[in-house]
């Protein structure tokens, strides 16, 4: 299980070890160009490819992308249908590239809601890349932070039914080991494109001590230069994890 930022002080550096991104603004990017919203989602796939490659080159070890939230089912049916098709196409087209780049793919979320073909493709892609370790790419699909905490609670109680009668034995570490990304360190840097400033039910537990970076740039236009700007901002942050600035003097700020 990964180290918790509320239980210990994680090691940090100039390059965030774990970057989490809400890829927002696809629809607005398309609307401003008098294109259907679906065109923006298609263009956003290219941005994913750019950012995965850029993170790998810069030494990021974990990249988590919010692809489809549990609330996105509320969108128009044709848009949801296209997003599902894009997911299928990306898995079919990109898995060989991920393998060549040493990228391990993880998909987290309630995958039972997807069609069997998509579930099968997800399983195959994860199995194909499971021995890679250069970059861990996690795609959150039909994911919600509250769902994650609920499913972890249920899994914890199934693993140890006696906890229901002795709740004082429940602590952060016991619950955290059942979260969908228990194997990964908590994000150091959270990025949201598109100008909105909220986390939208993404990694509610895991973002406790992440640095939050918001940019007006729409996701289809986001690439290596924009990622470098986020990293440059990140290097200015004083990551205290509950300590005072005085305690950090003479040592590393992050």
Curated annotation (Swiss-Prot):
UniProt: Mg(2+) binding residues: 24, 211
Residues annotated for substrate binding in this entry: 25-29, 37, 41, 69-71, 73, 75, 192, 198-200
Top-level enzyme category: transferase
UniProt GO MF annotations: ditrans,polycis-undecaprenyl-diphosphate synthase [(2E,6E)-farnesyl-diphosphate specific] activity; magnesium ion binding
Comment on bound cofactor: Binds 2 magnesium ions per subunit.
InterPro entries xrefs: UPP_synth-like, UPP_synth-like_CS, UPP_synth-like_sf
Family annotation (Gene3D superfamilies): Decaprenyl diphosphate synthase-like
GO BP: any one term: polyprenol biosynthetic process
Keyword entries, A-Z: Magnesium, Metal-binding, Transferase
Listed EC numbers: 2.5.1.-
SUPFAM superfamilies: Undecaprenyl diphosphate synthase
One Pfam family linked to the record: Prenyltransf
Active site positions, chain numbering: 24, 72
An example Gene Ontology CC term for this record: cytosol
Cofactor(s) it depends on: Mg(2+)
Top-rank taxon: Bacteria
Entry keyword Magnesium: yes
Family: Belongs to the UPP synthase family.
Assembly and binders: Homodimer.
Functional summary from the UniProt entry: Catalyzes the condensation of isopentenyl diphosphate (IPP) with allylic pyrophosphates generating different type of terpenoids.
Protein's recorded name: Isoprenyl transferase
Species this protein is from: Bordetella pertussis (strain Tohama I / ATCC BAA-589 / NCTC 13251)
């Amino acid at each position: 299980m990964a180290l918790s930022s509320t239980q210990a002080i994680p090691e940090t550096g100039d390059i965030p070890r774990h970057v989490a991104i809400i890829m927002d603004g696809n629809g607005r990017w398309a609307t401003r160009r008098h294109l259907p919203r679906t065109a923006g989602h298609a263009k956003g796939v290219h941005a994913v490819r750019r950012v995965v490659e850029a993170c790998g080159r810069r030494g990021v070890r974990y990249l988590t992308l919010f692809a489809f939230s549990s609330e996105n089912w509320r969108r128009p049916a044709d848009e949801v249908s296209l997003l599902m098709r894009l997911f299928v196409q990306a898995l079919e087209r990109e898995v060989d590239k991920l393998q060549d780049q040493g990228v391990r793919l993880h998909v987290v979320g309630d995958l039972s809601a997807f069609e069997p073909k998509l579930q099968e493709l997800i399983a195959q892609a994860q199995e194909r890349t499971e021995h890679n370790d250069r970059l861990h790419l996690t795609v959150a699909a039909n994911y919600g932070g509250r769902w994650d905490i609920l499913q972890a609670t249920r899994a914890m109680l199934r693993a140890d039914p006696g906890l229901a009668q002795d709740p004082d034995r429940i602590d952060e570490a016991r619950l955290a080991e059942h979260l969908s990304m228990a194997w990964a360190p908590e994000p150091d840097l959270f990025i949201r494109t598109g100008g909105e400033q909220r986390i939208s039910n993404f990694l509610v537990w895991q973002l406790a001590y992440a640095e939050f970076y918001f940019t007006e740039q729409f996701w289809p236009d986001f690439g290596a230069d924009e990622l470098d700007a986020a990293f440059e901002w990140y290097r200015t942050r004083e990551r205290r994890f509950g300590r005072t600035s005085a305690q950090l003097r003479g040592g590393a700020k992050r």
